Structure formats: structure tokens, C-alpha cells
């Protein structure tokens, strides 16, 4: 569901069920925030690494604080522009545009 609260519940369960767990990779940064909260509550900050996607400002703060290992910046702003351009091309020509590659950047404490 991409929600911070639900991610915290799921991460807490995973941490309980798998005491040797070393990392959690979350599908977005909101879920990563929930996972970080669960790791913190379990007293396992530093022992369990957490990563996310989207590069939101709240994730950046946790990276700077050492609670979140990294986030992936998928450049959503570019994806939105490409989506609009694709739609306009389809409307104008009826042709389906070729795939476009967009960069994905790993954001760690070294980039902040």
C-alpha cells in the first residue's frame, strides 16, 4: 500500500521473525521511513540497513543522520515530462514512441 505506518508494522514483524536480518529494501521512501522507525524501535539501528526509492527530503534527513543507508532518485520530474511528451506524440501521430532511458542515481551520505 506504499504507506509508512503499514511498512513499520511489516518491518517490525520481519525483524521479529528474522533476528539475523541485515537489510530492508523498501519500494519507496515513505515505506523506508516506516522501516527505519521499526528498526529504531527494535534497537537495531546500525545493525539493519534500510534503503528506499524516490529521494524525498525526509529520506535525506535520515541518510544524513545515518539511519537510512540510501535512496534511489528516479527523477520523477523527468518521468512526468516524458509521459506528457509521449501522450502528445500519440495524439499527434498515433505512433507509440520508443522507450526512453532515464537516469537513476543512488543517493548516500556522500552525495548530501
Q: What residues fall within each predicted segment?
A:
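Second-shell loop/turn segments in exported
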Residues: 20-23, 70
Amino acid at each position: 500500500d506504499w504507506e509508512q505506518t503499514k511498512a513499520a508494522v511489516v518491518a517490525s514483524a520481519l525483524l521479529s521473525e528474522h533476528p539475523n536480518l541485515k537489510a530492508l529494501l523498501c519500494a519507496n521512501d515513505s515505506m523506508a521511513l516506516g522501516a527505519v522507525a521499526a528498526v529504531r524501535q527494535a534497537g537495531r539501528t546500525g545493525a539493519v540497513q534500510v534503503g528506499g526509492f524516490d529521494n524525498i527530503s525526509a529520506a535525506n534527513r535520515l541518510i544524513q543522520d545515518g539511519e537510512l543507508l540510501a535512496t534511489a532518485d528516479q527523477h520523477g520530474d523527468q518521468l512526468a515530462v516524458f509521459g506528457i511528451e509521449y501522450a502528445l506524440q500519440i495524439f499527434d501521430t498515433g505512433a507509440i514512441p520508443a522507450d526512453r532511458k532515464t537516469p537513476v542515481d543512488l543517493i548516500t551520505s556522500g552525495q548530501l
